[in-house]
Amino acid sequence: MTMTDSSSPAPEGPAAPAEAAAPAKVDAQAPLVTLRLLLSLKEAARILGRGGNTIDNIRKANGVKIGISTKEKSCSDRLLEVTGSIDAVANSLADVVKVLTADDTNEEDAEPEPEQHIFKHLNFILPPPSPDEAEDPMKVKQIGNLRLIVTNSQVSSIIGTAGSKIKKLIDTHSSKLVVSKTFLPDSQDRILEIQGFPNSIANCIKDISQTLIKDDVLDTKEKRYYPHSKHSKDIHVTATVAIPAEYVGALLGHGGNRIANLRKYTRTKITVAQEPNQNNEREFTITGNDQKSVKLAQNMIMKNLGTEKERRLEKQ
């Protein structure tokens, strides 16, 4: 499918934190909708902007109530919630996409977003767009993804009978849409991922909002998701690292001493598969009580692997 930029663009939002936005006119008669997005910590920081300038510009430009949940300890996700008229909410989310797809011209020292998040719901379901998917290959970087949080009953309305409604959204707005198969933790919420140009995503949001109002499922009694850590002892964060079998011994160390020290330093549990997989790799499974510890253990294992590879090359 070729993605095209919408011929009827949403009003331009703030492209940078420094831009001042004129207050938008609010239609008091228009029905209000509230939509929620799942964000990574890095995405949340970009949308907030320095001193909250970016989100404030989006708020003023579109006349919406918009905010991001507080950062919870041991959580790698935050929620964005926006309330306003259908058009205002859709256009503000188009502005969010523009912020997330803008070049990091002011973030020279920022680390790139990791390809895989330990909190699996942050990992995009859809693959990144390729240049041949855009009508203008030079604009492919403007294509973004949103993780819209929807309840199970809302999913049914959005998909429609035999997928008729979601197919129409895809065809009409030259966008890609997919619904997660699993619920967000401790909730009846799922992710509706939308990929496309900002204006195309805005038009999708408008149609989705109209559908939710028409089917009377905009406000449901289903259990909603909120980032939470519970008590430390109840948290179980897991990640796996595949290591070529020939390097496993070196990473374990004499008598398992090296891996034991790594466990102690990172405060994680690390187990190693007894048998290699079809790629002749053995999986290291890391389990801990928080994202940071597990990620640290993961990085240290990969660093040790790189060091061992270099050592062997030098001996050749």
Curated annotation (Swiss-Prot):
Key word RNA-binding present: yes
Record Pfam families: KH_1
Top-level lineage group: Eukaryota
Region Disordered, annotated ranges: 1-24
InterPro entries: KH_dom, KH_dom_type_1, KH_dom_type_1_sf
Compositional bias of kind Low complexity: 9-24
One GO CC annotation: P-body
Annotated function: RNA-binding protein involved in the correct localization of transcripts in the cell. RNA localization is a widespread mechanism for achieving localized protein synthesis. Involved in structural and functional organization of telomeric chromatin and regulates silencing at the HMR locus.
Family: Belongs to the HEK2 family.
Protein name: Heterogeneous nuclear rnp K-like protein 2
Lineage of the organism: Eukaryota, Fungi, Dikarya, Ascomycota, Saccharomycotina
Name of the gene encoding the protein in the UniProt record: HEK2
